[in-house]
Amino acid sequence: MPLTTKSTRLSAQDWLQRIRELDLPEKVRILNVCGGHERTITQAGLRTALPANIELIPGPGCPVCICPEQDIFDAIQLALNEDIILVVFGDMLRVPVNVPKREIRSLEQAKAAGADIRPIASPMEAVNIAMSHADKTIVFFAAGFETTMAPVAAMLAAGAPDNLKVLLSGRLTWPAVAMLLKSGEASGESFCKPKFDALVAPGHVATIMGPEEWQFVVDDYALPTAVAGFSPESLLAAFYSILRQKIEGNVFLDNCYAEVVKPGGNLVAQKTLSAVMDVSHAHWRGIGSIPDSGFQLSEQYAAFDARHFFSWENDSQRKHAGDMPPGCDCTRVILGNLYPNQCRLYGNACTPRSPIGPCMVSDEGACRIWWSGGLRQIDSKTLTSNSLDSKTMA
C-alpha cells in the first residue's frame, strides 16, 4: 500500500528528516525522466541535502533535447518560405543543428535572416494566428511529450483552420525508459546502460496518461517507482517511498502526486489523442529509433500534416541530418551516463549564451538547469571514466 498518503501535509524538512532516519545498507541510484523534476532537485539543492548514499540521476526528460535534427531542418526550410508563418514553442528557437558556420543553424538564426517565426505558449495561439492570416500557410512546429501532444490533439479535434499545418515531433516517455531497462540498445546503436535502482515518474505525464503507465517498471524489473509532482515536498515524498520500498523489499508503484494524478489519468485527453494521433516508431536525437515512441497524425487528420503537404526530397541538408555535434556529450547526459558538468564542452565551448548541444538550450535540459542553478564547476576528474559512480556536485 502507498507509504506517502497525505504527503503534502509534511514540509520538505520533515521529509528530509524521515529520509535521514532510514537505514540504507547501500547506495541507491534514483533516475528522473522529467526536466521539471531536475529543475526542482537542482534549484532546491536536494542532492546536497540528501544523505551521500542517495544518488539522483537526470534522465531523458527533455523533449527539445531529443527532437531530431531532421525535424529542425524541416522547420528551418519551411520558415524561410515567404508564404509561410512558422509558429513554435519558444524553447525550440535556439536549438542548434550541425551545419557549416556560414549556414543557418537554428530557428533563431532563420528569424534573424528574415523568416516569419513566432514563438507561442499554447496551441490555440497557432489557431488565432492562422485565422488572422488567411492568406498565409501557418506551420505549427510542435515538439513535446504526452503533456504537449494532448492539447495539440484537442486543437485539431476542435476544428482547426485549413491554412494551419502541423509539423509534429511528439514522443512518448515510457518507451525510452523501457528501452533503457530492456537492453541498452536503440535501432542497433548500443550505449552504456545507466545504473539506476529506482524511478521517479513524471507527474504531468501521469496526469494525462495515468500512473499505471509506469507499472511495467515494477512488474517487469522489480524497481521501486513513484510518481511525483514538482515541489520539493512531492519529490522528497517520492524518494522516501522509493527508499522504504528498497529497504523493506516491497516494491510497488506509489502515487505521491495524488492531489493531481488520478487513477486512469485523463480519459477525455487519452481518447482525443487516440483519435487524432497514431503511435509509431520514432527517432530520438542521439539515441536512435525507439519502437512505438512517437506520435504522428492519423489518416483522418492527414490534411493538417505538414509532411504530407510539403516536400523536402531535394534538400541535401535534411538528408544528411545527424545527431549531436562533435565533442558534445548530450546523449550521455540524456541517458543518465554522465552528469552535465562531466560533458567535455560544459562551461567551455558550451554555455547558455552560446550553446553547442540541445541540453544547454532548453529550460528542461539538464545542462541548462545545472548552469542556471549555479553548478558551473567542471568535473574533470571523471571525464575519463564517463560514469556516475560518485557524487560530482560542485
Regions inferred by a protein language model and the residue ranges of each:
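Internal helical hairpin/lid segments
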Residues: 236-332
